[in-house]
Amino acid sequence: MPAAVDTAKTISKKRKRKHGGSAREATDNGVATSPAENGVEGKATETTTELTKDKDVELAKKVVKEEAQKKRKVSHSPSDEEESESEDEEKKEEDEKDNVKEDSGKANVPDLPSVDAVSLPQPDGGPKKFTELGLSEKTLQGIKEMGFETMTEIQQRTIPPLLAGRDVLGAAKTGSGKTLAFLIPAIEMLSALRFKPRNGTGVIVVSPTRELALQIFGVARELLTAHSQTYGIVIGGANRRAEAEKLTKGVNLLIATPGRLLDHLQNTPGFVFKNLKTLVIDEADRILEVGFEDEMRQIIKILPNEDRQTMLFSATQTTKVEDLARISLRPGPLYINVDHRKEHSTVEGLEQGYVICEADKRFLLLFSFLKRNLKKKIIVFFSSCNCVKYHAELLNYIDLPVLDLHGKQKQQKRTNTFFEFCNAKQGVLICTDVAARGLDIPAVDWIIQFDPPDDTRDYIHRVGRTARGANGRGRSLMFLQPSEVGFLKYLKEARVPVVEFDFPAKKIVNVQSQLEKLISQNYYLNKSAKDGYRSYLQAYASHSLRSVFDVHKLDLVKVAKSFGFSTPPRIDIQLGSSLSRDKKQQQQGRRSYGSQPKGLKFKRKHEDD
């Protein structure tokens, strides 16, 4: 029997020398030590040394063997593996890499484990801060550098289930923090699966407008500062060949507009998307409103749907959004609406008002308001591109500097204007609804709706450019003609609180005579004014709320005066044209909001957006 004990001790010592040395020795032997492993080892030693003389040699060997097997089964966390991965394992991994062809061909791209195979952090209770979510240190570092600590309501309710791999249909008002709500889980997934460029694209974010896509790209870039994953953007108007080259090299996180994304999916052979794990559709209602329904259906059909997590965010829930959710989300998605119990549809820090003004006094009132608020940061919304062009040219000509943003501009011009206004502390941006969705422009003081929004949803998105964030403050002003006050009823039904603002007539700067003289003498401004006048009437005639915004009730003489004409100019226009409203919206949407896929061209005599 003593021989049995000696044998057991000898085995234990050998095992201890083999596995219980320093961390360096363990690493050299290809084993990553951890507190869990040391506990198992200590238990094995104690169990072995405490064997009584009544135990035989075979039992001692059996105990030692069982404990050794337990040790081999101890799982390693990703962080432990990174810190103490053995040289043999690294060599093996390099051999595997050499066997993988880097030509981005779909058949040769290595498969990745499913999202369900990765244990993503699942928070307990109701976390309020990002540090309570169990996120990776690299992601937390990016969030901290961005200056965020406490989550908004949409982030509190969506991030935990998204981290757990659930499909989510989220509804939240603009400015609520949706971008971080979907980017954080997406980046955590890429990090957990250790995506490499050779694995292709793991996350695709679809955005309705180029500017919103650029904004999401900027947020993703800050979040990924400490991560090794690659990221990129494909949007209409940009260099397609350069985009294709980047996609071929491997873009793990891709932000895109629908038309250009579909173009690359169909026509870029090196675009690897077989490993797609997450699809994010942001501002889904707007994507569908501007005519990309067919493209979205094709995109969803092309993309792999096995084990794919889908996040669909929409400020409003329409029938089309529900149809898109039905074909894109897996059965049993989680529906999260953070606004349905709230008293108002707009954010609390927003003071909203309207002013009733005759058509011929509209420009005079706008000019006076801008002159009195030169130190403020203001966005002015118009109904068409031509209206924006005319007013930008006019205001800049008369030494009231403004920036302009609309769908007829080249992409580089739009991008430069957007970032210039974002970085400005004061100034005026006049634009179409291309800037109404999702754009996070810092510290906007006033939103002016010079031309009426198409409906209450557009109104909400326009005013959402100010009072953003947890404690954001801002004000909005809507111009209404006496015949348009019926729109207030629709705002009340939509739970939008507005009050009437009073602007004394004596404070309005009367420059009407100088304006008419300038327009009559300056050929280029005269032509621009005619285009703006025509587009204003066409946009008015196509309004969805025709019972309120009836073009036949307009006083054309007064409208013409607001554009600088003493008498209405002769223009070629067809009110109530043969184009249906939906088709017209689709055409305007493609030009103003995103990229237009190949083979889709629209012929029209007058482009009025």
From Swiss-Prot:
Keywords from the named record: ATP-binding, Helicase, Hydrolase, Nucleotide-binding, Nucleus, Ribosome biogenesis, RNA-binding, rRNA processing
Region Disordered, annotated ranges: 1-131, 576-609
Residue numbers binding ATP: A172, K173, T174, G175, S176, G177, K178, T179
Subcellular location: Nucleus, Nucleolus
Extent of Basic and acidic residues compositional bias: 51-69
Domain Helicase C-terminal: 349-519
EC number(s) given by UniProt: 3.6.4.13
An annotated GO cellular component: nucleolus
Intervals of motif Bipartite nuclear localization signal: 361-377
Motif Q motif: where in chain: 128-156
CDD domains assigned: DEADc_DDX18 (cd17942), SF2_C_DEAD (cd18787)
Biased composition range(s): Acidic residues: 80-97
Biased composition range(s): Low complexity: 586-596
GO molecular function: ATP binding; ATP hydrolysis activity; identical protein binding; RNA binding; RNA helicase activity
Quaternary structure annotation from Swiss-Prot or TrEMBL: Associates in the nucleolus with the 60S and pre-60S ribosomal subunits.
Entry protein name: ATP-dependent RNA helicase has1
Biological source species: Emericella nidulans (strain FGSC A4 / ATCC 38163 / CBS 112.46 / NRRL 194 / M139)
Gene from which the chain derives: has1
